[in-house]
């Protein structure tokens, strides 16, 4: 809700990257992009980067269509999912958006460790399935911290896949009520 992740992603993305953030207006963590937030978040872009802010439910077909228009046929190199923390919600975000990721690209999920008070929702349950289904998973966990954590999935490379090339360094966030 505060834009910290968007700022950090803009700092590490390619100079020409397109960064797209999807956020549900009025979500449980104050989501959406008010005019003042839009000005601030767009100022995160550096060099020739472009930041697109989409107010919408990541599960709505119209939201996905808006993303596709902005991508204009380009694949996503890095997809960060930190939205609907229900099992069904995070699974749907993964199923709807991971097919848009380039071969050799990465998908990152936030809050993959079960929190004793339930703060991380059920992302951890879906992460356990992904660890079984994908050989290239990696958990990034802070020792001694309950819950949270990042789960990284490296998608298999195809014959045309390359490392985060500048001509297609696209980042997206399917973040329902939590992020940006």
What is each of the regions a protein language model found here?
Residues 1-180:
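S-adenosylmethionine/decaboxylated-SAM
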């Amino acid at each position: 809700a505060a834009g910290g992740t968007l700022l950090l992603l803009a700092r590490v993305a390619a100079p020409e990257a397109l960064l797209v953030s999807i956020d549900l207006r009025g979500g449980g963590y104050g989501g959406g992009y008010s005019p003042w937030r839009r000005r601030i978040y767009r100022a995160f872009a550096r060099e020739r980067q472009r930041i697109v802010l989409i107010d919408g439910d990541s599960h709505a077909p119209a939201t996905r269509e808006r993303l596709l228009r902005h991508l204009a046929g380009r694949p996503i190199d890095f997809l960060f999912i930190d939205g609907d923390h229900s099992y069904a919600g995070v699974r749907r975000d993964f199923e709807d958006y991971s097919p848009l990721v380039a071969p050799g690209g990465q998908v990152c999920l936030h809050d993959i460790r079960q929190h004793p008070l339930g703060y991380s929702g059920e992302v951890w349950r879906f992460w356990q399935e992904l660890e079984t289904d994908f050989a290239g998973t990696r958990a990034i966990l802070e020792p001694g911290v309950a819950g949270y954590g990042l789960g990284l999935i490296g998608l298999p490379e195809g014959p045309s896949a390359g490392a985060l090339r500048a001509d297609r360094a696209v980042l997206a966030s399917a973040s329902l009520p939590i992020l940006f």
